[in-house]
């Protein structure tokens, strides 16, 4: 974990106690609900800071990895094929784009002072410019 400039939250995805959905480890049948949430925990108090319940089929859930930026934004995918930006301070969704199922973590880079978020879906690479 890394704490930077007083902003000290750790982001974890909630897991289902029944195991994985057949990708590895224990296999669970295809019926029922798969609850999911994106949570932030204050590392100084070890108490939950906020929680975002994933909407969608069978409880939704996140997909791919999570990117946290110095600008207090989080980027990840949901089970409905959306690429979602969250406010890292309160967990509120700020923006989304339906680009398909994410299986990889997004990346960030800057060109000439402008920050971009890059994410791959299948054989397509998407780049989104962040506001200035």
PLM feature segments, named:
Residues 2-3, 8, 13-22, 33-35, ...:
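Extracytoplasmic beta-rich repeat domains
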Residues 5, 79-80, 123, 131:
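Residue-level signature of beta-propeller blades and closely related beta-rich strand-turn architectures
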Residues 34-44:
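Beta-propeller blade signature
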Residues 35, 71, 80, 122-123:
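Surface-exposed loop/turn positions within WD40 beta-propeller blades
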Residues 43-45, 88-90, 131-132:
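Short loop/turn segments that connect beta-strands within beta-propeller blades
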Residues 104-132:
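Blade-level signature of beta-propeller repeat domains, shared across WD40, Kelch, NHL, RCC1
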């Amino acid at each position: 974990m890394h704490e930077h400039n007083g902003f000290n939250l750790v982001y974890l995805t909630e897991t289902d106690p029944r195991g994985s959905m057949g990708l590895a480890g224990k296999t669970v049948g295809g019926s029922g609900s798969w609850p999911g949430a994106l949570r932030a925990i204050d590392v100084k108090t070890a108490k939950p800071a906020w929680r975002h319940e994933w909407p969608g089929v069978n409880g939704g859930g996140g997909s791919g990895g999570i990117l946290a930026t110095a600008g207090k934004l989080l980027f990840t995918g949901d089970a409905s094929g959306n690429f979602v930006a969250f406010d890292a301070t309160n967990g509120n969704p700020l923006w989304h784009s339906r680009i398909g199922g994410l299986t990889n973590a997004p990346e960030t880079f800057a060109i000439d002072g402008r920050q971009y978020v890059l994410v791959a879906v299948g054989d397509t690479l998407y780049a989104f410019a962040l506001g200035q």
